Swiss-Prot record:
Free-text remark on how the cofactor is bound: Binds 2 Mg(2+) ions per subunit.
Gene3D superfamilies in alphabetical order: 3.40.50.2020
Binding site for Mg(2+) 2: 177
Cellular component terms per the entry's GO annotation: cytoplasm; ribose phosphate diphosphokinase complex
Organism: Enterococcus faecalis (strain ATCC 700802 / V583)
Pathway as given in its UniProt record: Metabolic intermediate biosynthesis; 5-phospho-alpha-D-ribose 1-diphosphate biosynthesis; 5-phospho-alpha-D-ribose 1-diphosphate from D-ribose 5-phosphate (route I): step 1/1
Gene name in the database record: prs2
Designated name of the protein: Ribose-phosphate pyrophosphokinase 2
Protein purpose: Involved in the biosynthesis of the central metabolite phospho-alpha-D-ribosyl-1-pyrophosphate (PRPP) via the transfer of pyrophosphoryl group from ATP to 1-hydroxyl of ribose-5-phosphate (Rib-5-P).
Length: 323
């Protein structure tokens, strides 16, 4: 553990989604994880017990709403309610991965905006602040009427590539779609590299998608960047398209390794040399295939918690360590 934190009113609790990350965060802050238990009744109902006094405390609850999404979300809501009823002074939700973020707008008639519904539930339960990481849609910050601190994984991912000598003019940072251009540009700034964009088009119905590459990638080391990888279909096809276009090597990176369904097999079979991910979502050892390298956001989030508690800006955390 780092130096013991000076203020005993700061308390950190972990629920079940990602306890290893919570332990790293608590270690970075300099506190022990708070004592609580989460159990289920035989019918599946969730019960939370806080096993120490938190009256007047500034509480931070660590919980990603990754799979099982609904169980993890319900755990969080029940915990917030318990903290409120136990007279916590502030209830700060630390959600490294915000589930339901892809449902941020009405893409078709009569669709819900579930990302907003989740925000409403968290606020109504009693949260006073949200701390999260690389939201799928940044406008989700505006779904809350409480303060939202939005951290970026790009500096940590950039540090990984810089430490492995992957930077400069021989590198091209690639966005797998139009929506990720801003994210790719940020990583490119850190790596002092140009960017390219993959433009997916379906020429006509029942014809396979064509991947047009906007930018020069021949003979270059390409670094794909996305906020999350779910089934890995897009990222694998993008990597193969870059290789076919003459790329020397292809690396991929994301903040949130959802990696559901056929994702691991697709990554294994693809042209990707290495996939760099963070530990915002817990990956069991059997899912950490050889191609996956993991960097931790524990210190980043721990530093953010200390800055928030001490009323300091979090903007210095948006830079790489290797300047």
């Amino acid at each position: 553990m780092s130096k013991h934190y000076f203020d005993p009113r700061l308390k950190i609790f972990s629920l079940n989604s990602n306890r290893p990350l919570a332990e790293k965060i608590a270690d970075a802050v300099g506190v022990e994880l708070g004592k609580c238990s989460v159990t289920q009744f035989s019918d599946g109902e969730i019960q939370v017990n806080i096993e120490e006094s938190i009256r007047g405390a500034h509480v931070y609850v660590i919980q990603s709403t990754s799979s099982p999404v609904n169980d993890n979300l319900m755990e969080l809501l029940i915990m917030i309610d318990a903290l409120k009823r136990a007279s916590a002074k502030t209830i700060n939700v630390v959600m490294p991965y915000y589930g339901y973020a892809r449902q941020d707008r009405k893409a078709r008639a009569r669709e819900p905006i579930t990302a907003k519904l989740v925000a409403n539930m968290i606020e109504k339960a009693g949260a006073t602040r949200m701390l999260t990481l690389d939201l799928h849609a940044v406008q989700i910050q505006g779904f809350f009427d409480i303060p939202v601190d939005h951290l970026m994984g790009a500096p940590l991912i950039a540090d990984y590539f810089i430490e492995h000598g992957i930077q400069g003019d021989d590198v091209v940072v690639v966005s797998p779609d139009h929506g990720g251009v801003t994210r790719a540009r940020k990583l490119a700034e850190f790596l002092k590299a140009p960017i390219a964009i993959i433009d997916k088009r379906r020429p006509k119905a029942n014809v396979a998608e064509v991947m047009n590459i906007i930018g020069h990638v021949e003979g270059k080391t390409c670094v794909l960047i996305d906020d999350m990888i779910d089934t890995a279909g897009t990222i694998s096809l993008a990597a193969n398209a870059l290789k076919e276009a003459g790329a020397k090597d292809v690396y991929a990176s994301c903040t949130h390794p959802v990696l559901s369904g056929p994702a691991l097999q697709r990554i294994e079979d693809s042209a990707i040399e290495r996939l760099v991910v963070t530990d915002s979502i817990y990956l069991s050892d059997d899912r950490k295939i050889v191609k996956i390298d993991e960097v931790s956001v524990g210190e980043l989030i721990g530093d953010a918690i200390k800055r928030i508690h001490e009323n300091k800006p979090v903007s210095p955390l948006f830079e790489t360590k290797n300047k």
